[in-house]
């Protein structure tokens, strides 16, 4: 599990074919790998990847065809900058929100505009996940935990504060860029609770009113 608080920015140094799958090598000079071992997970632009090889300042992870087909990795080339976060520990400060590293969709940046020292960004997502986005809710974009400032149909707005601009790859976003999106897992759990009809419990205590009174709905 991750929090969406980026620890370092690395870059892809190689993408190597391994039969039907691939390996990706990531250079990460500014990420402390001293406590990382083979088999650990590192979120790489929001994608949970398992470390299979390790050096003092780089790691290698496997990439399946499934990962390539469902994430923006399909668009990456050698030199691509990537946001990095090691899996959280029980002692980690929980500064963002719950991030699984399982990408829900690939979206497109449709507008970038400077607003003082911040950057306003509009992103268009596939229509099937727009229902999970809500104003002032959380979303993960290329591994970064962010707050949704506005939603219009399948498009949403982010305002990126200067610190996040400096510490992540977001400063490099351009119109047309493809980005990894992970919606807030709580939205999916709420949907499941509302949709599941258990034969043994026809009198469910969960209602839209209950969810709203407890702060799950705005």
Swiss-Prot record:
Alphabetically ordered keywords of this record: Repeat, Riboflavin biosynthesis, Transferase
Gene3D superfamilies: 2.40.30.20
Matching InterPro entries: ATP_synth_asu-like_sf, Lumazine-bd, Lumazine-bd_dom, Riboflavin_synthase-like_b-brl
PROSITE patterns: LUMAZINE_BIND
Quaternary structure and interacting proteins, as annotated: Homotrimer.
Protein function: Catalyzes the dismutation of two molecules of 6,7-dimethyl-8-ribityllumazine, resulting in the formation of riboflavin and 5-amino-6-(D-ribitylamino)uracil.
Record protein name field: Riboflavin synthase
Protein's organism: Photobacterium phosphoreum
